[in-house]
């Protein structure tokens, strides 16, 4: 299995521009023989989208842009793409005027293949410390009642996690129980000294404990 990491320079709110970057990166990877392309956490919306998430029109536009990416890559036969994006179940109107409404939005990653959105995974562990305030905007994937996202790619079973999920054992354990041999972990978070080393150590810990290999992005 050949994997490409689409490390695009996303701009918050620029759905058209971010989608274009994802499509272009995926096409380049496909031309070089990649089976799987992984884009970063919330790469479609840009990170962090914050109060844009409270606008129903923005959430609908995200869903339309995601489907547009899938259609744009329909001719890339055999290519699978994982894209990070905001995801919403249903529509309760503008939550800025309904402070008591339960959040329906999720920090998600979707598998695109064959011109369509095949499956979606919702982040389970939401950071809410230092610069992170994801619980203000997102519900945990546990509330979505979803199974782990595990799919076959060139003969390898790939599980999907999102950022903070990899810092806890349960999401990786769930992916392994669903048959994952490899994890694709989407990330987007601020840099600090030795962060790369910390991530590498944590991914190695997850790999040794749960899986044979881990891809991180």
Where are these regions (language model features)?
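Enzyme catalytic cores with a strong preference for nitrogen-chemistry domains
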Residues: 1-217
């Amino acid at each position: 299995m050949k994997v490409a990491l689409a490390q695009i320079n996303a701009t918050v709110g620029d759905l058209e521009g971010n989608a274009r970057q994802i499509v272009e990166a995926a096409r380049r990877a496909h031309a070089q023989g990649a089976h799987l392309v992984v884009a970063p956490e919330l790469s479609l919306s840009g990170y962090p989208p914050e109060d844009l998430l409270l606008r129903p029109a923005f959430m609908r536009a995200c869903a339309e842009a995601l489907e547009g990416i899938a259609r744009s890559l329909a001719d890339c036969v055999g290519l699978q793409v994982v894209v990070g994006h905001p995801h919403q179940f249903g529509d309760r109107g503008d939550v800025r005027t309904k402070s008591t409404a339960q959040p329906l939005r999720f920090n998600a990653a979707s598998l695109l293949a064959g011109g369509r959105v095949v499956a979606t995974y919702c982040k389970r562990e939401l950071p809410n410390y230092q610069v992170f305030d994801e619980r203000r905007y997102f519900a945990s994937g546990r509330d979505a009642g979803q199974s782990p996202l595990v799919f076959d790619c060139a003969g390898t079973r790939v599980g999907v996690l999102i950022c903070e999920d990899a810092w806890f054992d349960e999401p990786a354990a769930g992916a392994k129980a669903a048959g994952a041999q490899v994890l694709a972990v989407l990330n987007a978070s601020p840099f600090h000294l030795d962060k790369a080393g910390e991530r590498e150590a944590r991914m190695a810990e997850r790999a040794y404990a749960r899986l044979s290999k881990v891809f991180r992005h």
